Amino acid sequence: MSSYLFTSESVSEGHPDKIADQISDAVLDEILRQDPKARVACETYVKTGMALVGGEITTSAWVDIENLTRQVICDIGYKHSDIGFDGHSCAVLNAIGKQSSDINQGVDRESPLDQGAGDQGIMFGYATNETDVLMPAAITYAHRLMERQAQVRKKGILDWLRPDAKSQVTLKYEDNRIVGIDAVVLSTQHSDNVDQKTVHEGVMEEIIKPILPAEWLSKETKYFINPTGRFVIGGPMGDCGLTGRKIIVDTYGGAARHGGGAFSGKDPSKVDRSAAYAARYVAKNIVAAGLADRCEIQLSYAIGVAEPTSIMVETFGTGKVANELLVGLIREFFDLRPYGLIKMLDLIQPIYRQTAAYGHFGRAQFPWEKVDRAEELRAAASLK
């Protein structure tokens, strides 16, 4: 019997890097509302008392960058100097330019179907049947802990909570099946006037216990709640934040490979984002069809070229049919050209700010989480 531990982490919407991601995607959403053909690559940097929004944007839309940035920061919960960051009074700097015409000529085509990829690169998608959302369990529960932290904070259930937080979940596996939770780490920013006993008890009762499956917890499970003993200075006062620095948190928590490209602030012509979503969609439908228990897809593209330069499938010995057959089914049922996958997943819509915290995958509201091709795939593979 093989036994091993596997760990994934998540961060809250108030983590500095996630503040940056949410600002970048809020800018993208507002532009897409006005200009579906916009080209957007928006980057954000946050530090004590300031937010810098930059990048390359070509659009007919007009967006009040300063007001939108302040709104996002305040919505997260940073709206008073006592917390260390105040969306009402922080400086907002705008350093946005236009996308290079050299890139435009490779992407834009007379026929939309011939639209080229916005850059070269490799993208991965993954699915596993170990959770109901066909995502790895460790990252799924790490995200849910962070969502619960925000819910408890915003409802005032624990009024000493502050926006910045991190979680980490270590699962124990035997023969590739989860048998329990070995360790939980949860660090949360808090007010200066609360003692650590109160923090520990509050986090256990209001955040950890309502989220983690009771059958996975035991007297051997280890809990590390604010293990440094104090977490008052947080958010951009504690660390600077930058768009695109939480790419493993955004995807599969280390359970699958990553092509290296970040998502937030990029319009769907950037295959770093859109093709990673498409790869997840393909992998999830393969697992939902029962063609594999685990499935990882790799796609690759060349800048200015519509067709993917490669498609790879890995099922880790769990496939019910050959990987080569799965590649053929992918080519038959999924249009993975940039314009094709944008249409297939209806990506030209202002949905991206909500992706920028708690993971881009495993959340039913997003179109790449549909399993509407599973029955077709199953039938085509001749599985009864």
Swiss-Prot record:
Mg(2+) binds at residue 17. SUPFAM superfamilies: S-adenosylmethionine synthetase. InterPro entries: ADOMET_SYNTHASE_CS, S-AdoMet_synt_C, S-AdoMet_synt_central, S-AdoMet_synt_N, S-AdoMet_synthetase, S-AdoMet_synthetase_sfam. This is S-adenosylmethionine synthase. GO terms for biological process: one-carbon metabolic process; S-adenosylmethionine biosynthetic process. Pathway: Amino-acid biosynthesis; S-adenosyl-L-methionine biosynthesis; S-adenosyl-L-methionine from L-methionine: step 1/1. Homotetramer; dimer of dimers. Keywords: ATP-binding, Cytoplasm, Magnesium, Metal-binding, Nucleotide-binding, One-carbon metabolism, Potassium, Transferase. The keyword Transmembrane helix does not apply. Its EC number is 2.5.1.6. Catalyzes the formation of S-adenosylmethionine (AdoMet) from methionine and ATP. The overall synthetic reaction is composed of two sequential steps, AdoMet formation and the subsequent tripolyphosphate hydrolysis which occurs prior to release of AdoMet from the enzyme. It is found in: Cytoplasm. Belongs to the AdoMet synthase family. Its main location: cytoplasm. It is an enzyme of class 2 (transferase). ATP binds at residues 15, 164-166, 230-231, 239, 245-246, 262, 266. Its cofactor is Mg(2+); K(+). GO terms for molecular function: ATP binding; magnesium ion binding; methionine adenosyltransferase activity. L-methionine binds at residues 56, 99, 239, 270. Residues 99-109 are annotated as: Flexible loop. GO terms for cellular component: cytoplasm. Pfam families: S-AdoMet_synt_C, S-AdoMet_synt_M, S-AdoMet_synt_N. Binds 2 divalent ions per subunit. Binds 1 potassium ion per subunit. It catalyses: L-methionine + ATP + H2O = S-adenosyl-L-methionine + phosphate + diphosphate.
